[in-house]
Amino acid sequence: MANVVVVGSQWGDEGKGKIVDWLSERADVIVRYQGGHNAGHTLVIDGVSYKLSLLPSGLVRGKLSVIGNGVVVDPHHFVAEVEKLRGQGIDVTPDVLRVAENAPLILSIHRELDAMREGSNSGLKIGTTKRGIGPAYEDKVGRRAIRVIDLTEPETLRPKVERLLAHHNSLRRGMGLEEIAVETILTELTSVADQILPYIDQVWRVLDERRKAGARILFEGAQGALLDNDHGTYPFVTSSNTVAGQAAAGSGLGPTAIGYVLGITKAYTTRVGEGPFPTELNDEIGEFLGTKGHEFGVVTGRKRRCGWFDAVIVRQTVRTSGINGIALTKLDVLDGLEEIKICVAYKLDGKRIDYLPSSMGAQARVKPIYETLPGWSETTAGARSWNDLPAQAVKYVRHIEELIGAPVAMLSTSPEREDTILVTDPFHD
């Protein structure tokens, strides 16, 4: 049985929540391996909506759910999200939820620093959620982070906090902010320790044992591959690696355990926040896609930018993430359009190119080269087989497969999990 990594193939918001929920019914273990509570997703089960941003989707189905070491954990948000799920009737206990003991913590100083930087009139606005994700990763790389396991050792926690604040207070002085006392952070941590410590574990061992026992493991990615810190539209990216390779590093399970990479791909393109977007539509078609597709962020409520499908960036993600097949989502949003365009290449300084360049200036200058396909007037909403789809919709899907170099393994035609056409089961070897 193959273990499956789910990765967004664009800039996030591709509809991973529904697909992960669909797959989680077939999985035994669900793992979050990167990011924090900055990327949300909505699950709709029996008419009830569950909005998650930190906890793995498998909790809603009672499956063992793991927060890996690649995730930065806001302990107060963790507690709040657990309580919210319990309020919706979901049983959340250490039997079904584990947190990597070596996961770094997000603290109030990270949130304040994030907001201060993003709100500054000087410098480059990245479009962060101001939830402290980036500064927490900075401290991890700088080897001064407070990790979950540190909450179990009060005798070593104080010197670690002192070292952390030596760095942060120097930053705060430069920004004209009041310095933070060691006791303030210690109180912040000890106030929540008893609520998070029952869930901690050496998750790499848990996952290795489950793998050897034949469990199906689903790795749940957040955001999208074009927000990857290395392979995305830098600097308009997130602070972690979002490509499929991070599933191994962010969970402690070796890369040979990964059997199938599923790229979640929207039938058009959206982006939240700043950064290049070659196929963006600032016209009535863009408004149509945003309105019909309900394109507003789960976490921030921010309106998403919308545009035509960009085969260049998805083809690039297929390569950088080793995608075996895609789950194409929101095809129904395109219903009713007379014609549909697909970006097949870019023009950069008069030259045709088939990739997204790495430099910020070049990314801003690329112009899309489009192919135009006829649309369809019939509905695709709720389709559960290829025979239910209009002929032109099938042609659109097949053309996407050709352009990106990967087959459609799943096709989603509404937010409801049953409205899914399965072509290839990712869990089958």
Swiss-Prot record:
Recorded GO CC terms: cytoplasm
Cofactor: Mg(2+)
Record: residues binding GTP: 12-18, 40-42, 304, 330-332, 412-414
Enzyme kind, highest EC tier: ligase
GO annotation terms (biological process): 'de novo' AMP biosynthetic process; IMP metabolic process
InterPro entries in alphabetical order: Adenylosuccin_syn_GTP-bd, Adenylosuccin_syn_Lys_AS, Adenylosuccinate_synth_dom1, Adenylosuccinate_synth_dom2, Adenylosuccinate_synth_dom3, Adenylosuccinate_synthetase, P-loop_NTPase
Localization (cell): Cytoplasm
Active site, renumbered: 13, 41
Keywords: Cytoplasm, GTP-binding, Ligase, Magnesium, Metal-binding, Nucleotide-binding, Purine biosynthesis
Binding-site residues for Mg(2+), renumbered to this chain: 13, 40
Catalysed conversion reaction: IMP + L-aspartate + GTP = N(6)-(1,2-dicarboxyethyl)-AMP + GDP + phosphate + 2 H(+)
Residues given in the record as substrate binding sites: 298-304
Binding site for IMP: 13-16, 38-41, 129, 143, 223, 238, 302
Pathway: Purine metabolism; AMP biosynthesis via de novo pathway; AMP from IMP: step 1/2
Pfam families reported for this sequence: Adenylsucc_synt
Record's subunit section: Homodimer.
Protein name per the record: Adenylosuccinate synthetase
Source organism: Brucella ovis (strain ATCC 25840 / 63/290 / NCTC 10512)
Organism classification: Bacteria, Pseudomonadati, Pseudomonadota, Alphaproteobacteria, Hyphomicrobiales
